[in-house]
A protein has these predicted regions:
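Catalytic core of the metallo-beta-lactamase
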Residues: 6, 10-17, 114-149
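Active-site environment of divalent metal-dependent phosphoester hydrolases
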Residues: 9, 29-30, 61-65, 89-92, ...
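Metal-dependent catalytic neighborhoods of phosphoester/phosphodiester hydrolases
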Residues: 66-76, 94-95
């Protein structure tokens, strides 16, 4: 497994089977009303992310679910599965749909799914903060991704 740090909470995780998981895409432009900026600016063009297989969104804050970045990505990315915590919060699902995502995989706390041959994802939810963490497991590797919680 290879992990490329893009910026902030955005990682590009590549499995040995070359599946690509993009986390919390904030890739382009400012966030939080121009108060936060990516530094350094991303070295990648939007085409670099054209073959993403999954997107993981940890929570609904703008620096993790960034509309300008989503619009900047190739349009077909909105068809890939979005793995997200199921807080029971309608606003998050409504936001995904408003941003053009239709393939939502909403996981409850401690719920696991297998996304590919021997690639397992387990969701951990912090209900107090409406945030989440993710455990990505393969036969011989575990990666724990935690953001603001």
């Amino acid at each position: 497994m290879k992990i490329e740090y893009i910026n902030h909470a955005c990682l590009l995780i590549k499995t040995k089977d070359n599946k690509k998981i993009l986390t919390d895409p904030w890739l382009h432009g400012p966030s939080w009303g121009n108060n936060l900026w990516i530094f350094p600016k991303s070295k990648h063009t939007s085409d670099y992310f054209s073959d993403i297989d999954y997107i993981y969104m940890s929570h609904g804050h703008e620096d993790h679910l960034h509309k300008k970045s989503i619009d900047w990505l190739p349009e077909h990315i909105k068809e890939v599965p979005v793995i997200s915590p199921d807080f029971g919060a309608k606003y998050l699902i409504d936001t995904y749909k408003k941003y053009g995502f239709s393939n939502l995989v909403m996981l409850k706390d401690n719920e696991s799914i297998e996304i590919d041959n021997n690639i397992r994802i387990t969701m951990f939810i912090n209900h107090d903060d409406h945030d989440s963490s993710l455990l990505l497991s393969t036969d011989n590797t575990n990666v724990f991704f935690q953001t603001d919680n």
